[in-house]
Every structure is written in C-alpha cells, then in structure tokens.
C-alpha cells in the first residue's frame, strides 16, 4: 500500500538517527571517564570481570586498648592499665608506645609474634611499674633502634636483658639508643638496706650494660636520676661506639673508678647536678685525649681549696667544657659563688684551721678528759691516809730487805766471819 510504503522509510530513518545519537553519547562518556576505570584493550573479559569483583585487602586489626595509625605505622597503648604486651599488635608497627600501664614483669620473648614485628624500631615502655625484665625480653625485634625503660622501679634487671635468652651465645643487639632514666627502686624496695642496696643496684645495671657484645653498637645512653654514688669500674668497657652519655641528676661524688679511655667516639658527656667536688688529673687527661668530647659540669658543689689547683688550670686552657664559665665554688664559705675561672693560685689554699664542727668535737673531748682527771684526783685525796699507810709499809719492807742484803754482804766479805759462821752452823 502506498501509505505503508511511505511510512517505512521514515521509520527507518528515525531508528538510524537514534542509533547515531546513542553512539555519540557513548563516545562522550568514554572520553570523559578516567582511563584507569576502563579495561585496556589487551585485558580479556574474564580478567575484567575478575578485577571488577575483587575486594580490597582487609585492614590489620588493632588491639582493643590501643590506637593505631597504619599511615604513621604507630600504635599507642597509653594509660590503659595493661598487665602484659598485647598479643595482636599489627605487623606494620614501627613506633610502639606502651606507657602508663601496670606491667610489672616483662618476660623473655615478650614481643615474639607470628608474623614477627620486624619493622618495630621505637619502643617506649616508660612508666609501667616494671620491676622485673627477663633475659631476652626484646628478642625477635631485629629492627629495634630506640628503647625507653625510664620511670620503672627495676629491682631485677637480668644481665642478659639485651643479650638474649641464650646465655651461651652473645647476640649483638640492634639498639642504637637506650633510655634508662629514673629506674632506681624506692628505698624501701632495695635489697640489704639503703647504701648496700644502691651498690647492688649499680652492679645490676652495670652487668646488663656490659653483657657480652650485645651493646657494642650503642650510640646513645641515658642514666639520669638514678642516685648513683659511683660509676662501677667496668660500666663503660663494652660500649666502644657510645657517642652520647647522660649521667645528670645523680649523686656522683667521684669519677675515680670510671674509665672513659675506650670511648673514642664520645661526643657529649652530661654530669650536671651531681655531687662532684673535684676532678683528678687522671680523669682530666682521659677527657683531653678524646678528640670530639664535650663535658657539661654545671651545678656541682665544687670545693675550692689547694686540691682544686690542677683542675682550675686545666679549665682555663681546655675547650672540652662548654659551660666552664658557669662553674662556681660551693665550699669553703669564703669562696662561695666565686667562678672557677676567676680563681688564682693564692685563692686555692688548704686552711690549717679546723672546721667548726671538728673544733666543737675536740672541745667536748677535752671537757670529758678533764672531768675524768678531776674524779681521779678526788679519789686520791679521799684515800690519802690509806695511801700514806700503804706507802709506809712499802718503805719498811724495802728497808728490811736492804738491811738483810747488807748483812749477808758483810759476812761474805770477811773470811773470819765466814769461818765463824760455818763453825756455828756445825
């Protein structure tokens, strides 16, 4: 039919126009979409479907009592009253803060995990009430570079804490920085009383630091605020790589037993706020022999007498002590607050007069001896008659003895008297 024939071509043209419009729209969408959202021409349909259906990998779990940041690779478990190290620490952790908890004991293998915490580099365990750290407590941490055990009252620090639990094999520790500030236990928790307990505590710390070859790579060591009286003789012998040593705010009265000769890389030594009174020539010579060291000595009670002369001369010539201009005398009273660099040889004398306390002691002793002497004389006076009679008896006895002696001598001297004596005897 004519009508049907006329509608056919117009309908076909309409469908063709719609198809062209659809192709144009599809091309515009393809051009505006990101190239990464479309599969490449070399990707098969099966691969495209697989990639479209794949899910992102699940995030690592975070312990319930902690805060985790995978981007910063940091885990913080702060003030959570934890009794032990969380078991489900994420393996990506590089910085771990376990502070302000209630972990009194840190046993061997406390950080052993599967998979291991191979990237853990910074570990802060300060303020956890730790009393005991076992041998090999930090094993299985091959990347550990900084360890902070400050503000824990350690009564039992194993000699193999940093060396590993296998005591027959000395395993080098990866540690570069070790912070042990204020780890001294309270006085009532020290063994064998106060002084003996301090000596035992110093020996315990020294044993942990010199265990085998464990810490020979250590660069930074802090031992501030531990009430040390003396440094153990071999405390620093196994730390040849040490660059920074912090001993401030202790009670050090002398460095006689310490040796710094082996610390050839030492750059800074902090001895502020101790009880040092004078430094001897042996210590000064060791410091002068270290090429790069800087020693800080402020806030010590220096005694400015004749024993200080060598130290004052050394201070005036050396550049080892950056704060030498701030060093002042604490004793004797007449020299208080005078700068060490301002002293001359005439100022540094040993006063022959005794200290006031010693003078008082001698006066008291003299009074006691005088009283004893007075009592003795009084006893003699009260017994003067008896003493006089006793002396008369002694005199009479001596006289009788001497008369008998003279009589026998006269008889023996005269032969006639001798014969007479013999005949009379017969």
From Swiss-Prot:
**Cysteine disulfide links:** 62-68, 66-77, 304-329, 306-350
Q: Does the keyword Translocase apply?
A: no
Give ranges for the Extracellular compartment. 32-361
Glycosylation positions in this chain: 124, 166, 281
The subcellular location is: Cell membrane
Q: Which residues form a coiled coil?
A: none
- Membrane topology (UniProt): Single-pass type I membrane protein
Q: Which residues lie on this side of the membrane: Cytoplasmic?
A: 383-426
Q: Compositional bias (Low complexity) at which positions?
A: 34-51
* SUPFAM superfamilies per record: L domain-like
Any idea where the LRRNT domain is? 53-91
Q: Which residues form the LRRCT domain?
A: 289-352
**GO CC annotation terms, alphabetical:** axon terminus; cytoplasm; dendrite; endoplasmic reticulum; plasma membrane
Post-translational modification comment from the UniProt entry: Highly glycosylated.
Q: Which residues carry this modification: Phosphoserine?
A: 424
Q: Which UniProt keywords apply?
A: Cell membrane, Disulfide bond, Glycoprotein, Leucine-rich repeat, Membrane, Phosphoprotein, Repeat, Signal, Transmembrane, Transmembrane helix
Q: What is its main location?
A: membrane
What this protein is called in its record is Trophoblast glycoprotein
Q: What is the lineage of its organism?
A: Eukaryota, Metazoa, Chordata, Craniata, Vertebrata
